[in-house]
Regions:
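C-terminal beta-strand-loop-alpha-helix "lid" module of Rossmann-like NAD(P)-dependent dehydrogenases
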Residues: 1-287, 292
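Conserved AMP-binding A3 loop
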Residues: 295
Length: 295
């Protein structure tokens, strides 16, 4: 009788878990649609600021501090985007692993990595391993907004402009040295079944190259859709140098916001996949327990 009672309790608990997992799967599925829509809606703005920045940069010979590589960089800021909640499979593990690999590479080149983390799970991971964080933010991984990124990016830009030879106030109020480069570690959303941990150097800004092949007889500056077209000429007001000063920080904010949106979509997709698998396993165990109880 005791064994039968324990089996009934196990059946009840397994059925309850299966319902919870299935509910989480449905919630994640509904959120993916919204996350994908936000990512798609932001894409034209991100592309347009790249186009404008390219036009402005091409109209000036000024060497901007956000574009120039520094010799012998001593410190590099690493901003990692993780989730606030769990139950999303290997989502956080994969992005944290990519961060660890980046940190090892930086150390091999004599550069000290300085970690900044978005997301409660990433913060908990580094706190558990007694790893000091120069900055931490949480509470918006599923629904990031520009306002959420204002404080982190202002601090990171100040840190880069200060450089490793100077000091500035950290988000927690302590004094820390500046940095000579800024890296971003996040998750790229490819599909419902594929989310790729990604590392990007944000500052100094890396040039973006077009991978499309050039056809024979086509010039690098020509428009492949119209061989007679010419690049437009622009007149800037105020001048191109002043515009570049304003546009580069906005470009960086746009890139990080796009990464946060992709990470949110990736988190939803990873959670849906994990909960779907957990639901299937729960029902498999439930059927096994019920079969045993009927013997």
């Amino acid at each position: 009788m005791a064994d039968l009672k324990a089996l009934k309790n196990r059946i009840s608990a397994t059925r309850s878990n299966a319902k919870i997992f299935h509910a989480q799967e449905l919630i994640a599925t509904s959120r993916i649609t919204r996350a994908q829509a936000r990512t798609a809606a932001q894409a034209p703005y991100a592309q347009e600021i790249v186009n404008v920045l390219s036009a402005v940069a091409g109209a000036t010979n000024m060497t901007h501090p956000l574009l120039a590589d520094r010799s012998n960089p001593k410190r590099a800021a690493v901003l990692i985007i993780t989730s606030d909640r769990g139950m999303c499979g290997g989502y956080n593990h994969n992005v944290l692993k990519a961060c660890d690999e980046l940190c090892e590479m930086l150390k091999e080149h004599g550069t000290e990595p300085v970690l900044y983390v978005m997301g409660a799970k990433g913060i908990a991971h580094y706190s558990f391993h007694d790893h000091h964080l120069a900055g931490q933010w949480s509470g918006f991984s599923m629904n990031p907004e520009y306002e959420n990124l204002k404080s982190p990016l202002e601090h990171l830009l100040d840190s880069y402009l200060t450089g490793s030879g100077g000091t500035l106030s950290a988000p927690d109020g302590s004094e820390i040295a500046g940095c000579d480069a800024i890296y971003l570690v996040y998750t790229t959303f490819r599909s419902m079944l594929s989310q790729i941990p990604t590392v990007r150097r944000m500052i100094p800004i890396e040039p973006v190259y077009d991978d499309d092949p050039i056809t024979l007889g086509e010039d690098l500056l020509s428009d492949p859709t119209d061989s007679d077209s010419l690049s437009p000429e622009y007149e800037f007001e105020p001048d191109a140098e002043e515009l570049l000063d304003k546009l580069l920080p906005r470009y960086i904010t746009t890139r990080v916001f796009a990464a946060a949106l992709e990470s949110a979509a990736s988190e939803c997709a990873a959670r849906r996949t994990a909960m779907k698998a957990a639901t299937a396993v729960s029902y498999t165990h439930l059927r096994a327990h019920e079969t045993r109880g009927n013997l």
